[in-house]
Design a protein with these regions (language model features):
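Aromatic- and Gly/Pro-enriched, solvent-exposed loop/edge beta-strand patches characteristic
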Residues: 8, 12-32
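Short, surface-exposed beta-strand/strand-loop-strand elements in extracellular ectodomains
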Residues: 1, 190-196
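Mature extracytoplasmic enzyme cores
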Residues: 24-190
Length: 197
């Protein structure tokens, strides 16, 4: 189960000067027995690859994405245990083979791993995570609200351009994420382009 309707948690900052941390209460997500924490790590603002007038692709901090977490467990007897990320975590490539805040996300559904974030998953062939240095020792709590889903819109119009191109019109100019259901042959490529009038 995910952590709600949030699409983008980590906000922009000068990553070589400070890192923004977020806190979540995961109590309701725990169950008796084995539990698993799964993370999908993207480039975000830290490893911005697309060129733009702001030159984020040339930022001094730009590097491979990194992740750290600490789980605080408070037991009924009053004791506390801390579990942190380290090299016992396991990692592999995901179906998201490219992602950029400005340009696109490339998703290969043939690489989906059912149950990868569930107890009992067979992670044979996965790699142990590599411990690495933080870009800075300054960690601050993120106080701004994350980007989250606030509404859903359905296309109101569909115009066929040719056998491989359709234009869908939505009733509102938004910043959002497209959701679609399709049927087709395995390996078929779909390309979504977003625009505004």
């Amino acid at each position: 189960r995910g952590l709600g309707d949030v699409y983008k948690r980590q906000m922009y900052t000068h990553f070589d000067k400070r890192i923004l941390s977020v806190t979540h209460d995961v109590t309701s997500l725990l169950s008796l027995g084995e539990n698993v924490i799964g993370v999908q790590l993207g480039n975000g603002w830290y490893n911005h690859q697309s060129t733009a007038v702001w030159f984020f692709d040339k930022a001094s901090w730009r590097n491979r994405p990194k992740f750290t977490a600490q789980l605080h467990l408070r037991y009924t007897d009053g004791t506390t245990e801390y579990l942190g990320t380290d090299s016992t975590w396991q990692t592999t490539d995901s179906p998201v083979i490219f992602n950029s805040i400005y340009t696109a996300e490339h998703y290969d559904a043939q690489k989906e791993l059912a149950g990868w974030d569930s107890p009992g998953f067979n992670a044979t062939g996965w790699y142990h995570a590599q411990e690495t240095e933080s870009p800075t020792e300054t960690i601050k709590s993120q106080v701004m609200h994350p980007i989250r889903e606030t509404a859903r819109y359905t296309a109101t119009q569909c115009k066929k351009i040719n056998d491989s191109c359709y234009v869908y019109h939505f009733p509102q100019n938004i910043a959002g994420v497209t959701e679609l259901k399709v049927k087709g042959k395995k390996g078929t490529k779909l390309r979504l382009k977003h625009g505004e009038l």
